[in-house]
A protein has these predicted regions:
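Cytosol/matrix-facing juxtamembrane amphipathic
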Residues: 1, 37, 41, 45-113
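Select subsegments of transmembrane alpha-helices in polytopic membrane proteins
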Residues: 2-9, 157, 506-517
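Membrane-interfacial hairpin junctions
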Residues: 13-34, 527-536
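Transmembrane alpha-helices and immediately adjacent membrane-cytoplasm interface residues
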Residues: 35-57, 543-565
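ATP-dependent phospho-/nucleotidyl transfer catalytic cores
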Residues: 117-224, 249, 274, 298-306, ...
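Active-site activation/catalytic loop segments of kinase-like enzymes and analogous catalytic loops
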Residues: 196, 223-265, 272-289
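Alpha-helical bilayer-embedded segments of polytopic membrane proteins, i.e.
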Residues: 273-283, 495-557, 765-769, 809
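Internal catalytic domains of large membrane-associated glycosyltransferases
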Residues: 309-499, 567-845
Length: 845
């Protein structure tokens, strides 16, 4: 007020001098003083009004109310402002004087934005929960119209923000040393649990997926996802305690009447999180209300005690004011007020009479009921936070597959392959069923039945193609068109476009490369050659064609990776059962016998590969050659071979059995090299090994096998070939075997002996450099990235797989021995191939 008075007075004085200049000094001074006084008075009045009406003033209603509630010779100091600004003045007041004043802090009233969303149901027994689920299934009506809004997702975010604000109020009350309800401690200590679960909902329940969930057409959850209604019912009937057992029991009981979709089952954990967060929001609202009622009870108890002690005549007028301001006091307020008046009989008796008239119950009965409610709230909020933690620990993959009706149908796959596949492959099969069901309007379980029927029919037809009796052929393979016609179903435009691109991948790729090359030449080269003759333009354009085409290649590869989905291959799962005998695999590392130290280092690396890939049907070997020489035999050859033999035999002795093999061959004369070398170098090693395994040249066993039993090689199905510097990380060998062992990946041949598209003889995983090697040279630092180095096509080798379904082979991978030999045995002339990897990959796929 003073500041505004000075401001307005100064402005009035300056205005007076300006308006009356020039004037006599005496009269001008008098006018100026009068103007300053009048301006100051106006400023003071305006400042007072502004303070009263602004956030810095105390509301007149508060002044009038508290003036009525004071007793004689009593002073009150009212501070009105944000709750976080009161900590310092409250501390000062509590430390002032020998007898500090009574201090009361009243928090603002916050309304729950979505009201009370807790269902009024009572806890049910397990049998009652299942009956409740069945009744819900009969009552639920699904809205056939698609839902376009995301109201529930907004509610979750608002609930999270609102609970955070409540936590700020509760923590501020704790700093002000105010009494808080018992549930407040749970909320403050576990706010991070709410935050993490709300974040989980945002990440795992995207808007598009949410809008695909079936919605309810009847109340009380009209327009909301059906699975949300189930989650609310389960949370309510289980008293906010959700675990694996009651989730399974509730949903299985519901599905005994009405089947849930695959998407709904995947949304179960997120909907349970939403239901629990909303229940915690209600409990937080109750805690905040109880905090405010506790503060109000403190104040009115102080008023009654003060009136009783200092002016008993005002006791009943204060009580009348209390009854007027609290016409319907809550049981919590009543118990808190009575607790404060416990030793004040004169004040307690009328208050007790007033409360008993309102509730028509005795105070002891009211107090008992309130204690039971508080105990129930503590149990509920403890259950809610425990359930949120439990949801994060559950294996939802196993729960989903246990609940899914589609999963149960697919496990009747006539080939028996489906149940032996890994989870990601089974999930891709189920997503295919979702897509077909969505496009056809048929239930998902009906689509699954049709796929099983086609596979079963193929078993009766005895076509000789094992793929036809596998349900995956009709979901992911060439039989999908047949299934789509049977349903019937019109595939999505995106799916049809992708299939067309896959069938014409070469044309798409080269047309795209030509298009971008032409665009870049026209945009970059031609504008700078204006005024030149056509011949000069043509020459310069041809000279720049290679660098421009490289730029076009990078752009095209980027677009392919961004626009086409990854083409992951289906896989089996041998993690628990181990590699079957039918897929016994040999790991072979071709090396040279250079010196003893090198040999011991190679044996040690082979041992490391074994320790990282301990499997029953996985064998490990070195295939060695002597170094090139002008002589067929050198004097140190026998010593080096003996070192290798003893080292491999030591491994067999250390780990038991005959798991480690040593293959070796002598030098032969090479006319092209004019030296004695190992026949055809690495390609020759692989070819001789294949002949030994497939039985074409069994007599080679005595010549090639130096460590290990050759009889154990006859049942080898696959070979994993590695370079000396290639590691085999933990479990990698098994994952490669699982991929090549899947029926949809196993090699198939046409009548001419050529391998068919969609089947593979070689599976090559991504090859990445180790962390130390990425900084070993300038080249590595420039070209190594998050996906590593590809020796032939740099960092874009996945473009070939995503577009054409096959990649460039560079000598490290797993192959089917007999299919490999069938295609390549005797195909290449001797001493013609320097690098054999690419040409082998081109022939065998």
């Amino acid at each position: 007020v003073t500041l505004t008075a000075i401001l307005f007075g100064g402005l009035a004085g300056v205005a007076s001098l300006v308006l009356h200049w020039p004037v006599p000094i005496l009269s001008g001074s008098l006018v100026t003083l009068v103007s300053i006084f009048a301006g100051g008075l106006i400023g003071a009045l305006l400042g007072g009004v502004w303070i009263r009406r602004s956030k810095y003033g105390v509301e007149r209603r508060l002044l009038e109310d508290y003036a009525r509630w004071l007793v004689s010779e009593e002073t009150v100091l009212i501070l009105q402002g944000p709750i976080e600004t009161l900590r310092f003045p409250v501390a000062v007041l509590r430390e002032s004087g020998d007898i500090p004043p009574a201090v009361f802090v009243l928090h603002p009233k916050r309304e729950n934005p979505i009201g009370d969303v807790r269902s009024p149901g009572v806890p049910l027994s397990p049998a009652q929960i299942q009956e409740h689920a069945q009744r819900l299934a009969m009552d639920h009506e699904v809205d056939p119209r698609p839902r376009r809004n995301a109201e529930l997702l907004r509610r979750v975010e608002n609930a999270h923000q609102w609970i955070h604000q409540v936590c700020l109020d509760l923590s501020e009350a704790s700093r002000l040393e105010q009494g808080a309800p018992p549930t407040a401690e749970w909320i403050l200590d576990n706010e991070f649990v709410i935050e993490s679960n709300a974040r989980d909902v945002r990440l795992n329940l995207p808007r598009r997926f949410y809008q695909e969930l079936p919605a309810l057409a009847n109340e009380p959850y009209r327009g909301l996802p059906r699975i949300y209604g189930l989650a609310k019912a389960l949370v309510s009937s289980a008293e906010l305690r959700v675990d694996r057992e009651n989730i399974l029991a509730f949903i299985e009981a519901y599905q005994s009447v009405r089947t849930l979709t695959i998407g709904e089952l995947w949304a179960v954990p997120q909907m349970l999180r939403i239901a629990l967060i909303e229940s915690i929001q209600d409990l937080a609202a109750s805690a905040l209300t109880e905090l405010r009622e506790h503060e109000i009870a403190d104040f009115w108890a102080n008023r009654l005690i003060t009136a009783n002690r200092r002016d008993p005549k005002q006791l009943f007028s204060i009580l009348a004011e209390l009854a007027a301001t609290q016409p319907g006091p809550s049981p919590y307020f009543a118990t808190q007020l009575v607790d404060h008046l416990y030793d004040e009989d004169a004040a307690l008796v009328p208050v007790q009479s007033w409360l008993e008239r309102i509730y028509r119950k005795s105070l002891s009965e009211l107090n008992l009921r309130e204690q039971n409610r508080q105990t129930k709230d503590q149990i509920s909020i403890g259950n809610a936070f425990t359930s949120l933690r439990q949801l994060a620990l559950l294996d939802w993959r196993r729960i989903f597959e246990q609940l899914s009706r589609v999963e149960g149908l697919l496990r009747f796959d006539p080939s028996g392959v489906y149940s032996k596949m890994d989870f990601d492959t089974r999930d891709r099969y189920r997503r295919a069923i979702e897509e077909l069901a969505r496009r056809s309007g048929q239930p998902e379980d009906q689509v699954a039945r049709r796929a099983i029927e086609l596979a079963t029919q193929a078993t009766r037809e005895a076509t000789g193609d094992d793929r036809r009796i596998h349900v995956g052929t009709y979901l992911m393979g060439e039989g999908r068109r047949e299934l789509a016609r049977l349903i019937p179903c019109h595939e999505a435009p995106r799916f049809r476009v992708l299939q067309w691109v896959y069938r014409h991948h070469s044309a798409v790729y080269f047309l795209g490369l030509s298009f971008f090359s032409a665009v870049f030449i026209s945009l970059i080269v031609l504008p700078g050659l204006r005024g030149q003759t056509p011949g000069i333009r043509l020459v310069i354009a041809l000279l720049l064609l290679i660098p421009v085409s490289q730029l076009a290649l990078e752009v095209l590869n980027y677009l392919v990776m961004r626009l086409l989905p990854p083409r992951a291959l289906p896989k089996m799962d041998f993690k628990v059962s181990g590699i079957p005998d039918a897929f016994r695999t040999l790991v072979v590392v071709p090396v040279f016998l250079g010196n003893a130290e090198t040999i011991r280092a190679e044996v040690e690396k082979l041992e490391i590969r074994y320790l990282a890939n301990k499997e029953g049907n996985l064998l490990f070997s070195l295939f060695t050659d002597y170094t090139d020489s002008d002589q067929a035999h050198r004097e140190d050859d026998e010593r080096l071979l003996q070192t290798a033999t003893e080292s491999l035999e030591a491994l067999n002795h250390r780990y038991g059995g005959e798991r480690f093999f040593l293959f070796h061959r002598d030098r032969t004369w090479s006319a092209s090299e004019q030296k004695f070398i190992g026949w055809e170098r690495k390609r020759g090693k692989i070819e001789e090994l294949n002949r030994l395994i497939d039985g074409t040249r069994p007599e080679d066993a005595d010549r090639l096998v130096y460590v290990g039993n050759p009889d154990h090689l006859s049942n080898v199905r696959f070979v994993i070939t590695l370079d000396s510097d290639t590691q085999l990380p933990l479990g990698t060998a098994r994952r490669m075997i699982e991929t090549l062992a899947h029926p949809l990946n196993q090699p198939r041949f046409d009548a001419a002996g050529r391998i068919l598209a969609g089947s593979y003889t070689i599976i090559q995983p991504r090859v990445s450099p180790t962390l130390p090697s990425t900084s070993g040279s300038l080249f590595s630092r420039l070209f190594a990235d998050a996906v590593g180095i590809d020796p032939y096509t740099k960092a874009v080798s996945d473009v070939n797989q995503d577009l054409a379904g096959e990649g460039s082979y560079h000598g490290k991978g797993i192959y089917d021995v007999r299919a490999f030999s069938r295609v390549l045995s005797g195909r290449f002339p001797e001493e013609w191939l320097l690098s054999h990897d690419l040409i082998e990959g081109a022939h065998v796929r």
